[in-house]
């Protein structure tokens, strides 16, 4: 059975940049657990086993906020308070970077190098799924400063760029 925690973060970032928050949270949780990240923001072991699922919803109520839900299997015995702490600290540091202009290119610009270092699956074969249906097959070749994944389709002549809200990747 899954357990988890939910936290509300209020990063001082433009509304268009809040999409970066779940990536930053996943990166922080992965560091805390000695894990890796699978696109877009799933925390996994080095072998790809799921550790923590990160989901986020943004809104505006007396300022921008992001509600982040972290979910894991009960038998993992993770410390919710520790995960909340590292998530909050990472988002605060990221918001400071955004405020100083380090995210002018996009919300992930300040952390993209660290995200790539933690990312598991670059170059691996994937299926791109939309609505549960395969719409493309190829290899994950990039993630941009907006968090979009680029998949080089079979044959290598075309690339498909997808955002997390458009499609998901299944590693094959």
What are these model-derived regions, one by one?
Residues 1-172:
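Catalytic beta-strand/loop module used to bind and position nucleotide/cofactor moieties
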């Amino acid at each position: 059975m899954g357990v988890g925690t939910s936290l509300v973060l209020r990063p001082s970032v433009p509304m268009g940049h809040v999409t970066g928050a779940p990536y930053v949270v996943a990166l922080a949780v992965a560091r805390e657990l000695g894990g890796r990240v699978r696109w877009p923001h799933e925390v996994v072991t080095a072998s790809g086993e799921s550790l923590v699922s990160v989901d986020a919803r943004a809104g505006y109520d007396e300022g921008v906020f992001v509600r982040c839900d972290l979910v894991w299997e009960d038998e993992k015995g993770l410390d919710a308070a520790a995960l909340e702490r590292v998530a909050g600290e990472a988002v605060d540091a990221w918001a400071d970077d955004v405020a100083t202009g380090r995210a002018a290119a996009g919300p992930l610009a300040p952390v993209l190098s660290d995200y790539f270092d933690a990312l598991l699956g670059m170059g691996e074969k994937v299926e791109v799924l939309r609505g549960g249906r395969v719409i493309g097959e190829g290899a994950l070749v990039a993630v941009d400063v907006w968090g979009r994944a680029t998949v080089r389709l079979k044959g290598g002549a075309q690339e498909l760029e997808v955002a997390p809200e458009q499609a998901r990747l299944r590693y094959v």
